[in-house]
Amino acid sequence: EASQLLRDDRGRIKPFGKFFEEVRQIHPEYNERYLEAEHQFAVHSAQAAAQWAEIERDGNDYDLQYRTANDGKVRPAHAKLEGLTRPQDDPCWSEIMPPNGWKCRCRVVQVRKGKYDYTDRNEVSQLVREATTDLDSQGRNRAEMFRFNPGMDRVIFPKHHPYYNL
């Protein structure tokens, strides 16, 4: 129900404050922090999906490189991904296209082929696992749901998202 409130009459994404006011009319007790994280995730996923469509149009003309916000708020596991460079058709992009967590500010950019050395394939697998693993007290991986690519999968919320369990 709340997802229908994300866009205004012109189809533009509403600022969080406006979105939150409207959600509160439907669900007065909804947690603002959770809703803000979900709103940001939906916006980032939609932007990543649109970006992926552009990447697909360009084909393998460019390599892709993972970049963080490069500040003190970047998670250590995401910081390890900084500069990861692989071809556009590398399977890693099906699992590591941002957003890779709640309030993730990372991004993937196209870079000129040959400008950067490729990150070793075996190292990439390990880095992807580390960036998307966060075990809870029962040993379940809470971050597994972030192993997706919104553009490839054509979804805003990944298949393991709790929304699908309602």
Task: Give the ranges of each region predicted by the language model.
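Domain-core detector
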Residues: 1-101, 109-166
